[in-house]
């Protein structure tokens, strides 16, 4: 997908992206800007820890070649290769807490993968407490374009946050979204779950699947996370020659709880897998 199309898609997605959630702290600083508290270090210096030869171009974009080697957040069987070259105007920046410590995350959408229908997007974790250091980097792309997704981060306790990202693409009347819920343990990203939803805009109806997140602090050491997909259908306003769809809405919820035995979050049901399978029949 070329840069113009990515920009148009970004504008269309603003209602559900972190750019609208100022209270949650997502920002898009120019990479040449100095870090707060580190006037001799820029965001470009952080980005070069991921793409070593990244440099500013004459068109307002930053370009480079291959990033460092990294794993995919879903595991070794997921993801494609990074593009041989990439160019972007900025990166999304989000402050989080993990293990009671302040950390910085940056999300770089590098563009299309040469051997996969998915893109390649780097989620990087930095320690800025002393000399800035890259702690971890993962590919979080499961579709063509990737972003932080509102609410961007979720509090799992007094000193820990989870991060929410999304990957998506659209055609003329369908939208495909993969939402990643990610925590950080021992300064390493760990996937909690990947949730796939599907929107459809036909003449006779518009069907959307929107996500909401809620945490409960009664579980230790991490809060329980309840994710709800609201699957809603609204009748179309035009006469399509077909029977009008009835308005409907129902919620599908899954709760994730920390399991001390396996040291990870465990989902309470397979409802989202069943939703994904049902959606696939409508592609």
Language-model segments: residues:
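Repeat-based blade/solenoid architectures
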Residues: 70-90, 140-151, 200-207, 278-279
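Acidic, small-residue rich beta-repeat scaffolds with periodic aromatic anchors
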Residues: 22-75, 171, 176-283
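A glycine-rich, hydrophobic loop/mini-helix early in the fold
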Residues: 102-156
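Short beta-strand elements that form the blades of beta-propeller/WD-repeat-like
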Residues: 102-110, 160-168, 221-229
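Eukaryote-skewed repeat-based solenoidal scaffolds used as protein-protein interaction platforms
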Residues: 138-187, 193-198
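Bacterial N-terminal signal peptides
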Residues: 8-18
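Structural signature of eukaryotic scaffold interfaces centered on beta-propeller domains
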Residues: 89-100, 149-159, 212-219
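Bacterial N-terminal signal peptides that target proteins for export
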Residues: 1-9
